[in-house]
Curated annotation (Swiss-Prot):
One of its GO terms (molecular function) is diaminopimelate epimerase activity. This is Diaminopimelate epimerase. The keyword Amino-acid biosynthesis applies. Catalyzes the stereoinversion of LL-2,6-diaminopimelate (L,L-DAP) to meso-diaminopimelate (meso-DAP), a precursor of L-lysine and an essential component of the bacterial peptidoglycan. PANTHER family: DIAMINOPIMELATE EPIMERASE (PTHR31689:SF0), DIAMINOPIMELATE EPIMERASE, CHLOROPLASTIC (PTHR31689). It comes from Vibrio atlanticus (strain LGP32) (Vibrio splendidus (strain Mel32)). The record marks F270 as: Important for dimerization. It is found in: Cytoplasm. The record marks H161, E210 as: Could be important to modulate the pK values of the two catalytic cysteine residues. Its main location: cytoplasm. GO terms for biological process: lysine biosynthetic process via diaminopimelate. Its EC number is 5.1.1.7.
Length: 276
């Protein structure tokens, strides 16, 4: 099998992006894991696959696979790279691009300043739709592990997120708590774990341990989930700068029932071709 690909990143969250409209490729979990290996493969956090639309009201179908081969519902940084890729490769000439995902639909807008704004949809706090095991929605939940008791918010941005407010992200024990939260029994489909330091009402610092990928340089949906939780807990304003290890994202949300907007860059690194 021979195919072309692009390597891209959104604030250091890196992707292998493949056009599966003009190329016929099947990505098995084993192949994805081999390609994701940073020593013997291409190396990436996620594989992004561009497919023809499943829905006549959309322009493309957007699929995301983690480095462990699992398919996931959402990736905000990937969505920005997806938009740049389909424009760069001549698959569309639109500046506003409608895509479907495993869990819903998104609108990707290429801005004049070369940034990309993604309409991430309406944050979902209903436990059963996250999914999260709880009797009713709460602004803050208590999660217990064998040795830790954590106060967290939970939300779906098309994929599940748990958010813990910390005093300092630099000293947060992400390496220990990330895996414990990711596989916590109250999240039946596992979860992305965010650790948020509130600098002020319009700025936060964030580290994210991603489900199936580990800690990444940036997580777009994680930034969105963190801000949504922060706003519902009364900690943040409607417009927030999120400072991640890989760079900054700007998140805007007017509150319950309203769509959340994420704005940030998407960088093309190189094009390549593989035979495997």
């Amino acid at each position: 099998m021979h195919f072309h690909f692009s390597k891209m990143h959104g604030l250091g969250n890196d992707f292998m992006v493949v056009d599966c409209i003009t190329q016929n490729i099947f990505f098995s979990p084993d192949l994805i894991r081999r390609l994701a290996d940073r020593h013997t493969g291409v190396g990436f956090d996620q594989l992004l696959v561009v497919e023809a639309p499943y829905d006549p009201e959309t322009d493309f179908h957007y699929r995301i696979f983690n480095a462990d081969g699992s398919e996931v519902e959402q990736c905000g940084n990937g969505a920005r790279c997806f938009a740049r890729f389909v424009r760069m490769k001549g698959l569309t000439n639109k500046y506003s691009i409608n895509v479907s995902t495993k869990k819903g639909k998104m609108v990707l807008k290429i801005e004049d300043n070369d940034l990309i704004t993604v309409n991430m949809g309406i944050p979902e706090f209903e436990p059963g739709k996250i999914p999260f095991k709880a009797k009713q929605p709460e602004k803050t939940y208590i999660l217990r592990t064998d040795v830790h008791t954590l106060f967290c918010g939970a939300v779906s941005m098309g994929n599940p997120h748990v958010v813990t407010v910390v005093d300092d992200v630099d000293t947060a024990d992400v390496d220990t708590l990330g895996p414990l939260l990711e596989s916590h029994e109250r999240f039946p489909e596992r979860v992305n774990a965010g650790f948020m330091q509130v600098v002020n009402r319009e700025e936060v610092r964030l580290r994210v341990y991603e489900r199936g990928a580990g800690e990444t340089q940036a997580c777009g949906s994680g930034a969105c989930g963190a801000v949504a939780v922060g706003i519902t807990q009364g900690l943040l304003a409607e417009n927030v700068k999120v400072r991640l290890p890989g760079g900054d994202l700007h998140i805007s949300w007017q509150g319950p029932g309203k769509p959340l907007l994420m704005t940030g860059p998407a960088t093309h690194v190189f094009d390549g071709q593989l035979s495997c």
